[in-house]
A protein has these predicted regions:
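Auxiliary tRNA-acceptor-end handling modules of aminoacyl-tRNA synthetases
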Residues: 12-254
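Bacterial Sec-dependent N-terminal signal peptides
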Residues: 1-16
Length: 254
């Protein structure tokens, strides 16, 4: 009788251990499944891109999503000299300028400050040493160009190693790159651009340049043009952005 009792207790303990082991295995499998099924967090770049819109590839990859324009700026474009030329395409009668005339031109370059911001610097230096001279690097490191605007880095395109920035204010707002020079606005008696009646009409992208057509409305004082009597002057403008040669690159590394 004693032998039978001991065998029964031993059998009972073995079954209990098996149930515990099976429970542990089941919990482990459930935990692994939960890890696999956890969705990947969407990046800021993916959030913007999934909205669709138009994509144009050239000097920069340009995205037109809803009413905003974005550039994808690769690291290879940082420090490159870019020429921005603004011309009148349509003007009021007796305005003092004619369609086709150049309004102004500016040379600028992009500089990455950190992971959140790209600076736009206007190149205004007039003292340039000869290429290869020792003084050239010293001159570039001891002088500084003005920051005319900044671009917030919204996201990053891992495939092209490019930074996504919104450029709508660059072409629509009171931007130093595309706005008329202060001296010209003074002579034409123009005030600040009116945001609600200033538009980006088209943006066309090519391998070496980008062409932007805008309609710009300025507050105006009484001038020689009859249109100024309304308090506003509306202009048709074309902005041409193109890269300069490789020799014209601003030195940004020590």
């Amino acid at each position: 009788m004693a032998t039978t009792t001991i065998q029964a207790r031993t059998s009972y303990v073995a079954k209990s251990d098996t149930i515990k082991q099976d429970t542990v295995k089941h919990d482990s499998i459930a935990a692994d499944t939960a890890k696999v099924e956890k969705p990947k967090k969407e990046t800021e770049y993916e959030k913007i891109v999934k909205k669709g819109g138009t994509v144009m590839k050239g000097l920069f990859t340009v995205r037109h999503i809803e009413d905003k324009y974005y550039f994808e700026v690769p690291d290879s474009m940082l420090g490159r000299m870019i020429l921005c030329v603004n011309r009148f395409t349509a003007v009021p009668q007796n305005f003092g300028k004619f369609a086709g005339e150049e309004a102004n031109d500016i040379t600028f370059y992009l500089e990455k400050r950190d992971t959140t911001q790209i600076l736009v610097r206007q190149y205004v230096l007039t003292q340039i040493a000869k290429e290869g001279d020792n003084i050239r690097r010293t001159l570039q490191q001891s002088t500084i160009n003005p920051i005319v605007m900044d671009l917030k880095i919204i996201g990053h395109n891992e495939a092209n190693d490019a930074h996504l920035v919104e450029v709508t204010p660059m072409f629509k707002g009171n931007s130093k790159l595309t706005d008329l020079a202060s001296s010209l606005k003074t002579s034409l008696k123009l005030g600040a651009p009116q945001n609600n009646t200033t538009f980006i009409d088209t943006m066309k992208v090519y391998p070496n340049n980008i062409e932007i057509v805008t309609t710009r409305t300025y507050a105006a004082q009484n001038g020689q043009s009859p249109a100024s009597q309304t308090g506003n002057i509306t202009l048709g403008m074309n902005t041409s952005i193109h890269i300069k040669t490789d020799n014209n690159r601003y030195y940004t590394q020590p």
